[in-house]
Amino acid sequence: MGKYKKFFAIAVCSLLLFTVYFYRDPDRVITKGNNIILSPADGTVEYIKFYENGNPEVFKDGNCYVLNVSRYFPNGCYVVGIFMSPLDVHVNRAPIGGRIVYIKHIDGSFYPAFLEGVEKINERNIVIIKNGSEYVGVVQIAGFVARRCWLSIKEGECINMGQKIGMIKLGSQTAVIIPANYNITVKVGERVYAGQTIIAVKRTDN
């Protein structure tokens, strides 16, 4: 019996340590500057796509989701998808400062991942931030393991660049929607850090 108690104690301690590690929220020195867009998440750049018609999409777990935010990006936009592993810090931060003009939450499906013949839908949040005449978007996409993403902001709120805006649990993705008049400064496979890595710079010919 003592052997089982020891095993149980080790398992509980391991789970507790993992939980504390997963929910860690380390202090960050936020990168400052004008005409830049910061990464909203820690992770690895998974894809970079350009949409000429301004109607962007995001991709997760084999699914493609149209975001229906083309009214904010009439001249086209880039979408940078950032994969967040369970070992990454999962706190999301604002890529720019500005005012929250749009938030939309889409519920995910709660069917078991192994069930066939059922459309599996990732829970996600879409956030649009306005700064001057420009808009930048952040999309939280939860994985099927946890299916949980939440925001600590609301529409109409003014936020600062690098401010914490929410969190996603376990394996997940954060995407950022960037106006077409910016140059992307990261590459697929590159590591990025929320509030610190510059992922786009406004072109000077505009």
From Swiss-Prot:
Residues in coiled coil: none
Protein name: Putative archaetidylserine decarboxylase proenzyme
Membrane topology listed for this record: Peripheral membrane protein
Function: Catalyzes the formation of archaetidylethanolamine (PtdEtn) from archaetidylserine (PtdSer).
Pfam assignment, any one: PS_Dcarbxylase
Cofactor(s) the record lists: pyruvate
Posttranslational modification: Is synthesized initially as an inactive proenzyme. Formation of the active enzyme involves a self-maturation process in which the active site pyruvoyl group is generated from an internal serine residue via an autocatalytic post-translational modification. Two non-identical subunits are generated from the proenzyme in this reaction, and the pyruvate is formed at the N-terminus of the alpha chain, which is derived from the carboxyl end of the proenzyme.
Domain of life from the UniProt record: Archaea
Residues at the active site: 172
GO biological process: phospholipid biosynthetic process
The record's free-text note on cofactor binding: Binds 1 pyruvoyl group covalently per subunit.
Disulfide bonds listed in the record: none
Organism for this UniProt entry: Methanocaldococcus jannaschii (strain ATCC 43067 / DSM 2661 / JAL-1 / JCM 10045 / NBRC 100440)
Keywords: Cell membrane, Decarboxylase, Lipid biosynthesis, Lipid metabolism, Lyase, Membrane, Phospholipid biosynthesis, Phospholipid metabolism, Pyruvate, Zymogen
Keyword Membrane: yes
Entry's localization field: Cell membrane
GO cellular component: plasma membrane
Enzyme class: lyase
Phylogenetic classification of the source organism: Archaea, Methanobacteriati, Methanobacteriota, Methanomada group, Methanococci
Family: Belongs to the phosphatidylserine decarboxylase family. PSD-A subfamily.
